[in-house]
Amino acid sequence: MESFLTEIQIRVLNLRKKGHTQEEIAHVMGTSRANISMVEKRARENIEKAKNTLNIYNDIIAPSKIKVEKGTDVFNIPNVIFSKSDEEEIHVNYSSLQIMEFINQNAKRYIKNRMVVEPFIITILQNGEIYVHDFEEEKAKN
């Protein structure tokens, strides 16, 4: 399968996941720890670029976007998502509780004491996945 990662990067990441130190990996691969460090760093950068690319693509194909306004009670967000997804005939893959957990993890900086303090965008994909985007970044793109 084609990837943004080289075979060496994949091997290093797999070994790191198994708990090996960079020094141990360097010894096994016959190179320096500094080289392994650079390989790992570039692998993580490539992964981040791939994630960003997917986010851009998902944003392009997203059939539905919701602007969550300042002053919105966080507890109302799941209902807003379900209403919008029903309009678009999209089955959201999450329960209300899961959406609340998702919002808590991915939109913390926009929320204080249950209230939205800065607007943000929720994107609903055709496959039912949801994503959080910064409103100002979204506005700048359009």
Curated annotation (Swiss-Prot):
Protein name, per record: Putative transcriptional regulatory protein Mevan_1098
Pfam families in alphabetical order: Sigma70_r4, TFX_C
Primary role: Putative transcriptional regulator.
Organism, as annotated: Methanococcus vannielii (strain ATCC 35089 / DSM 1224 / JCM 13029 / OCM 148 / SB)
Keyword field: DNA-binding, Transcription, Transcription regulation
GO MF annotations in UniProt: DNA binding; DNA-binding transcription factor activity
Similarity comment text for this entry: Belongs to the Tfx family.
HAMAP family from the UniProt entry: HTH_type_Tfx
Protein's GO biological process: DNA-templated transcription initiation
Source taxon at top rank: Archaea
Gene3D superfamilies in the record: DNA-binding protein Tfx superfamily, archaea
